[in-house]
Amino acid sequence: MSGSGFSNRAFLTALAQDLPHGLLVVVPVVLPPAHPGRDPQWEVDVERMLAKAGARVLPLQGEAMLTSPVGCEALSAMAVRRAEPYLHGRSLLVGCDVPFLAVGSYAPKSADVLLVPRSTAAMVRPEDSSQIAWERRGLTVTVAGGGLVAAISDHMRDHLTGTYGLPDGVVLDLPNGLMPADQAVVHGPVLPLPAGATDGFVLAMGRAVESKGFADLLHAVGLLGDQGVAVPHLVLVAASTGERNSHQVQLRGLIDRLGIEATLLTRFDPRVRGWLGDPSLRAVVVPSRAEPFGRIPLEAFAAGAGPVVATTAGGLAQTVLDGVTGYSAPPASPQALAVALHRALDASPADRARLAEAGARLLAERHDYAVSVRSVLERCAPWALSARAGVSQ
């Protein structure tokens, strides 16, 4: 499950908690039973949460449509058609993430529209001109019709208003964050550590794509080794949902060529987040070249893990503040990343405690996701919150 998946679940959880019983309607894309990205326990947990909220769940069979602009356009139309019986009178239609950026083109005039993109092609696949054009059209049509767009970070706001040309006034701040359930995942069931990691390890995890910067991390570890710096065992979770992809093959070859002591895991299991609470953990590294937000530092702060080492790519610059909540380096610079990682490994117990305390404080003060979602609802659907207040009284 990607960071976007965790964030979308947190968004649903916040809505389920804030909205009156029975008001929430969810139109999810159903993955086939054998799909490698499907997590049965995750599914059970979400279904239970939605049932408790009295939510109506209207599933779509559209997994094959998620990979192209034409498919996403059709998926957006199907989703609105499925939800349309519930969109009369006061209603808010939320297009949650990129595949649903075109819902504003099909929404009935009576419905307000909010789009919540968690990334864009311009950020992670700048060569994909057709996808970028489709995203721009969906965003533009929505705001032209009076809809709004949520920005998950300051960087994403600048990106939406700059690269995609949205007026500043139509972009709402919805800073990404954690719900209590997300923090429970960090402290939940744990997989056994890989062999070699029990005496100390460095952890990095994310999707197996070049923009995550894992090759830069491997080169940084190699540079430290060349300098005689003892780097603990690297546990690299570079995950995909299918067969091993070309980037994973490249990473495996790089580990072998550089002679790095590392474990490469190519399939994601939510239980790996439990490693953030392991006392053998020496550092958490987020080496991204591009990052709309980046949840892993927050998860590390929630677990008291670290030090956190991250690049300043995108939203990471908001959470990993050099010398305050962690150590930072410019993106796509193995040399600078090696310096930051060396600082983390050399940090004294007092420094580690200070960084962890500052990270926990930043999480509590700026990234309480329940507070962020409620703030957006107060702007987009105050009538729903008023109804909830009326029910409570």
Spell out what each predicted region is.
Residues 3, 349, 353-380:
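A charged, aromatic-enriched C-terminal amphipathic alpha-helix characteristic of glycosyltransferases
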Residues 6-10, 209-225:
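A conserved mid-protein helix/loop that constitutes part of the nucleotide-sugar donor-binding site
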Residues 129-149:
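Membrane-proximal helix-turn-helix segments that form the acceptor-binding/catalytic region
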Residues 155, 177:
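Carbohydrate-associated surface elements
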Residues 248-270, 275:
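Nucleotide-activated donor-binding/catalytic signature segment of Leloir-type glycosyltransferases, i.e.
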Residues 289:
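Aromatic "clamp/platform" in nucleotide-sugar-dependent glycosyltransferases that forms part
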Residues 306-310:
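Short hydrophobic beta-strand element within catalytic cores of glycosyltransferases
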Residues 322-323, 327-334, 343-349:
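Conserved acidic donor-binding segment of nucleotide-sugar-dependent glycosyltransferases
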